[in-house]
């Protein structure tokens, strides 16, 4: 009885793999997964792990790995299809009958798979010493040639004769994606004079080929056309080998080419896969995330690689969250992954993995590095582009984190760096001379920004008194606060006249910094028409109170010989209370203002 591959996925989702495994293995819960003694080899220390969330098992000892169907197959000795049927019967799951059209489809698929397997056997027999020498020159060992079933498609008619002798006609070869048709109607071997690299699906079945031209010729690389069994948007080169390693290491490495995958596998990075001459798709990302929580992209550093990175970033942003991540390896100029590992060794590439950057860091690198931001228009365009990236993130918490990250980068790389040279003798110098800001200093800036942007808030006597009596750590800001209240607010200066007045004073740099539309000291945009000043003030006031509470708590702990535990407890209780209130305000205000 044949079942559709879609039913395999249904079983993986329906049946907890741990429920099936514990019928044969005593499992113990550990770090969200299960561990036990491997049923496939003798061991005294448990190295067999099972993950319900990833629907996967893996043995660190014998390397056995797979899904719930594969486990049943390994235990029972049944085929994969037979194991799926057994699981369905055991769990009372109805097996959908194939329609006549489905039967025809799967019969054709089986025939194509058989033809592709035959083609690969033929290509393997055509390897010559010259081709093996070429592969060895590329750093590929004879063992790796065998492991990846690398072959060669000759120019002569041996290919056609091979299949003719097996009574396989041109039509069937066409359905398998093995032949092409010239404009004059001539039929030819699609991979003629090319090194052949079989492409296998997750079940280790050959579904197509990649071909690398021998010598000069275009295109240099060629893939099988899409067929009944081969869809580029679904398939990743090397996935049949990589999935178990990805599960073990909790990450995958995604590269561009076949030889990148082969070189990295040979060097020990068996979690590597490649997209097949097409852009990365959502299907690719979800497939890799099922095996590991992080996808590490390692693309060429040229313009094409940067463009591919941008496409992948835009695709991934709506899909990522705090658990499912994307990161990037930045290769040295002129190197692709194949070169990186063959010329510099496995240790060099391992260090590149260790130095990988996050998706947010890659966005900043793409938008900032090597560009000029001298004009207001250039800076505005940078902020516009960064906000556009943030807007694509579906996870609200992550969206806020990205927004804050970019705000911090703008501050560190644009404001601080560009103003240092021109403000050594101004009141801004004490602000930007520090390498970082304490939370209290950031709040001082925020209070002053509020004063500049929303003077209407001073109509509330309590708020005016608070700001007026605030004792600033940064004395330059305190002087600005005093001057601004006395000269601008108390004299009811019109908004249109303020800049001209401040420009004549030593406070102009501070004024420019604080009056930016997008305030650098808060995760908000002041150009929002619907900004809630009441919530903003509550947030600032509570944050200020919390910081002072924490400082008093620290002083109490450090200065009391025999701690006044009752006092300490009161501080802890109040700190927790205010922190919770701030969290509520964060959700109702900060998230609201960046959407």
Curated annotation (Swiss-Prot):
**Database matches in SMART domains:** TOPRIM, ZnF_CHCC
As one GO molecular function, the record gives:
DNA binding
Q: Which cofactors does this gene product need? A: Zn(2+); Mg(2+)
* EC number(s) given by UniProt: 2.7.7.101
The record's SUPFAM superfamilies line, in alphabetical order, gives: DNA primase core (SSF56731), Zinc beta-ribbon (SSF57783)
Provide the alphabetized UniProt keywords: DNA replication, DNA-binding, DNA-directed RNA polymerase, Magnesium, Metal-binding, Nucleotidyltransferase, Primosome, Transcription, Transferase, Zinc, Zinc-finger
Q: Which cysteines are joined by disulfide bonds?
A: none
Q: Determine the domain of life of the protein's source.
A: Bacteria
Annotated residues for binding of Mg(2+) 1: 256, 300
Q: Mind telling me which residue stretches traverse the membrane in this protein?
A: none
Zinc fingers, CHC2-type class: 38-62
Q: Where is the Toprim domain?
A: 250-332
Annotated InterPro entries: DNA_primase_core_N_sf, DNA_primase_DnaG, DNA_primase_Znf_CHC2, DnaG_bac, DNAG_N, DnaG_primase, TOPRIM_DnaG_bac, TOPRIM_dom
* Top-level class of the enzyme under EC nomenclature: transferase
Give the GO terms filed under biological process for this record: DNA replication, synthesis of primer
The record's family statement is:
Belongs to the DnaG primase family.
What the record says about its domains? Contains an N-terminal zinc-binding domain, a central core domain that contains the primase activity, and a C-terminal DnaB-binding domain.
> How does the record describe its quaternary structure?
Monomer. Interacts with DnaB.
Question: What's its job?
Answer: RNA polymerase that catalyzes the synthesis of short RNA molecules used as primers for DNA polymerase during DNA replication.
Instruction: Report what the protein is called.
Output: DNA primase
| Taxonomic source organism | Rickettsia conorii (strain ATCC VR-613 / Malish 7)
């Amino acid at each position: 009885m044949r079942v559709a591959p879609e039913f395999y996925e249904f079983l993986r989702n329906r049946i907890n793999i741990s429920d099936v495994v514990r019928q044969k293995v005593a499992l113990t819960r550990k770090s969200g997964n299960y561990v036990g003694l491997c049923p496939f080899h003798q061991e005294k220390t448990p190295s067999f792990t099972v993950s319900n969330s990833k629907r996967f098992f893996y043995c660190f000892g014998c390397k056995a790995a797979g899904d719930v169907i594969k486990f049943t197959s390994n235990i029972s000795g049944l085929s994969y299809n037979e194991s799926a049927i057994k699981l369905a019967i055991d769990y009372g799951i109805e097996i959908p009958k194939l329609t006549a059209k489905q039967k025809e489809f799967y019969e054709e698929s089986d025939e194509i798979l058989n033809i592709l397997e035959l083609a690969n056997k033929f290509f393997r027999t055509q390897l010559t010493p010259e081709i093996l020498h070429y592969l060895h020159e590329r750093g590929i060992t004879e063992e790796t040639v065998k492991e990846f079933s690398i072959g060669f498609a000759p120019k002569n008619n041996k290919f056609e004769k091979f299949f003719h002798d097996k009574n396989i006609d041109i039509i069937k070869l066409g359905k398998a994606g093995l032949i092409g048709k010239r404009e004059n109607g001539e039929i030819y071997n699609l991979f003629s004079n090319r090194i052949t690299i079989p492409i296998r699906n997750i079940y280790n079945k050959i579904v197509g080929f990649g071909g690398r031209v021998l010598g000069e010729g275009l295109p240099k690389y060629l893939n099988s056309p899409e067929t009944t069994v081969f869809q580029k948007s679904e398939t990743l080169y090397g996935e049949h080998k990589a999935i178990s390693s990805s599960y073990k290491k909790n990450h995958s490495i995604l590269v561009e080419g076949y030889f990148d995958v082969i070189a990295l596998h040979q060097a020990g990075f068996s979690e590597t896969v490649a997209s097949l001459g097409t852009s990365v798709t959502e299907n690719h990302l979800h497939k890799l995330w099922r095996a590991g929580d992080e996808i590490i992209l390692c693309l060429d550093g040229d313009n094409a690689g940067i463009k591919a990175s941008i496409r992948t970033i835009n695709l991934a942003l709506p899909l990522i969250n705090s658990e499912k991540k994307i990161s990037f390896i930045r290769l040295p100029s002129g190197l692709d992954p194949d070169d990186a590992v063959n010329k510099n060794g496995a240790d060099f590439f391992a260090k590149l993995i260790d130095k990988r950057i996050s998706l947010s860091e890659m966005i900043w690198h793409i938008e900032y590095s090597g560009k000029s931001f001298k004009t207001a228009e250039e800076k505005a365009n940078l902020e516009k582009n960064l906000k556009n990236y943030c807007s694509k993130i579906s996870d609200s918490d992550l969206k806020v984190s990205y927004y804050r990250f970019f705000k911090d980068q703008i501050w560190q790389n644009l404001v601080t760096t560009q103003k240092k040279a021109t403000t050594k003798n101004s009141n801004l110098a004490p602000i930007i001379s520090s390498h970082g800001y304490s939370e209290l200093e950031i709040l001082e800036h925020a209070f002053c920004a509020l004063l500049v942007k929303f003077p209407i808030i001073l109509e509330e006597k309590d708020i005016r008194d608070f700001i007026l009596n605030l004792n600033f750590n940064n004395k330059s800001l305190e002087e600005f606060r005093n001057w601004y209240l006395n000269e601008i607010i108390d004299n009811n200066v019109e908004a249109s006249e303020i800049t001209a007045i401040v420009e004549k004073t030593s406070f102009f740099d501070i004024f420019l910094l604080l009056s930016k539309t997008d305030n650098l000291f808060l995760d908000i945009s002041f150009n929002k028409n619907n900004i809630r000043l009441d919530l903003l003030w509550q947030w600032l006031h509570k944050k200020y109170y919390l910081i002072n509470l924490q400082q008093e708590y620290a002083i109490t702990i450090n200065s009391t010989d025999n701690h006044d535990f009752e006092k300490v407890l009161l501080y802890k209780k109040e700190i927790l209370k205010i922190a919770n209130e701030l969290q509520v305000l964060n959700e109702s205000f900060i998230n609201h203002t960046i959407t």
